[in-house]
């Protein structure tokens, strides 16, 4: 039983079904209609430390490239690369140092000049001729709605079941006779399962509390004024044929192409929360469109199509939380920032832990560098277990980077 049909939950459910298990996926709304729908969906390991967490994310990049051919990747996988610009003295120094650092770890990253940037992205309008420009050719973005549609289709084609709405909204979690995990839904059903995996994003702490394990999944509070978890997502269009084809980051804006001839826009300095008035959201959205017009070509006819506050799940120590919960060992959780980057790889690791007897090849198809032992704890996940928070007062150390 998998709770939550965002990109991580759908990936986990599809991997487990592919490993030969009978899987039910529960979703209170419709698959892919929550946080994943509004994600910037930037697949990267750019500025993610320490080294083991960088390596986990780098493996996530490779995992999507490996999975794409099996899931009609042309519909959702965009290995476009990322251009990042820095204009201040401190920004230029930081970007140059980061590129050198990442390259030393074997991550594709290099500094380029304005001429090469123009060749890579003809739509780019350089804000400053003295800008430092970095090129990250291995990075990508995903169209999450199309991706999740294909993950769910693959799940059901392998015998999986998807329950949505009241049938998929979890209202209780406990164990029955023989300590069998049970999930109660808003439709009144009580469903037994051998394993329950919670991939419910920011709702995971509340579900952990239902299972009697309150406080074991510390996320940054996302529903209070001033929280760093919410971000403003703006989509604009139509975009002309001369518009951008790659991810672009500047100090003022982050943007990428989106489906339907739109651009997806975000910015680090647009503080919003779930209490921000609609009039302020519209003002900020218009501001982001003007910034985008100063950054890329193709937006002469564009207008704001959507402005949405997206509340992201941010673990308190900014690292993934994956594994069985202290106090409710029958409940397995997987919650992380960078869920889009990590979903393909984390789901593979989780399937290896929860599918004993699964042939090794089924878990590592297309990934010969990944060493997994089905049914055994994953060494790659050892640092990310919920138990690390036991007896601590975990808290976030700074604003979310969005990376």
Question: What does each model-found stretch correspond to?
Answer:
Residues 14-15, 43, 75-77, 202-327:
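Active-site substrate-recognition segment that forms the wall
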Residues 40-120, 252-254:
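Dinucleotide-binding Rossmann-like beta1-alpha1 core, especially the glycine-rich loop
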Residues 74-84, 111-157, 268-273, 329, ...:
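Helix-loop-beta segment of a Rossmann-like dinucleotide-binding subdomain
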Residues 296-403:
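C-terminal catalytic lobe of FAD-dependent flavoproteins
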Residues 134-187, 191-194, 199:
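Helical element adjacent to the flavin cofactor pocket in flavoenzyme catalytic cores
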Residues 1-24:
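N-terminal Rossmann-like FAD-binding beta1-loop-alpha1 element of flavoenzymes
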Residues 2-3, 190-203, 207, 347:
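Short hydrophobic core segments
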Residues 17-37:
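Glycine-rich FAD pyrophosphate-binding loop
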């Amino acid at each position: 039983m998998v709770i939550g049909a965002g990109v991580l939950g759908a990936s986990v459910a599809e991997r487990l079904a592919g490993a030969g298990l009978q899987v039910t996926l529960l979703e209170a709304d419709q698959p892919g209609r929550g946080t994943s729908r509004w994600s910037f969906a930037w697949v990267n390991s750019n500025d993610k430390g320490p080294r083991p967490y960088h390596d986990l994310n780098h493996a996530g990049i490779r995992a999507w490239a490996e999975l794409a051919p099996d899931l009609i990747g042309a519909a959702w996988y965009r290995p476009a690369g990322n251009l990042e610009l820095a204009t201040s003295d401190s920004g230029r120094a930081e970007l140059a140092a980061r590129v050198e650092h990442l390259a030393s770890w074997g991550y594709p990253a290099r500094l380029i000049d304005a001429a090469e940037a123009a060749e890579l992205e003809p739509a780019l309008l350089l804000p400053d001729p003295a800008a430092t420009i970095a090129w990250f050719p291995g990075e990508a973005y995903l169209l999450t709605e199309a991706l999740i549609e294909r993950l769910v289709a693959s799940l059901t084609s392998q015998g999986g079941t998807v329950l949505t709405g009241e049938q998929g909204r979890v209202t209780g979690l406990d164990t029955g006779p023989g300590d069998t995990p049970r999930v109660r839904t808003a439709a009144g059903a009580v469903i037994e399962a051998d394993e329950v995996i919670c991939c419910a994003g920011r709702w995971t702490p509340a579900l952990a509390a239902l299972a009697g394990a309150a406080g074991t999944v510390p996320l940054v509070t996302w529903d209070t004024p001033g929280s760093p978890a919410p971000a403003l997502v703006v989509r604009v269009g139509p975009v002309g044929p001369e518009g951008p084809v790659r991810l672009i980051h500047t100090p003022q804006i982050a943007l990428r192409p989106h489906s339907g001839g739109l651009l997806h826009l975000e910015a680090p300095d647009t503080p919003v929360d779930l209490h921000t008035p609609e009039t302020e959201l519209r003002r900020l959205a218009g501001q982001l469109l003007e910034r985008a017009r100063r950054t890329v070509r193709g937006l002469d006819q564009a207008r704001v199509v959507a402005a949405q506050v997206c509340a992201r799940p941010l673990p308190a120590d900014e690292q993934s939380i994956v594994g069985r919960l202290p106090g409710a060992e029958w409940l397995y959780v997987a919650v992380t920032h960078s869920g889009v980057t990590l979903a393909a790889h984390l789901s593979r690791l989780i399937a290896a832990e929860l599918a004993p007897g699964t042939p090794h090849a089924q878990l590592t198809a297309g990934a010969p560098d990944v060493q997994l032992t089905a049914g055994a704890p994953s060494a790659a996940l050892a640092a990310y277990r919920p138990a690390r928070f036991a007896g601590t007062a975990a808290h976030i150390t700074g604003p979310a980077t969005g990376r």
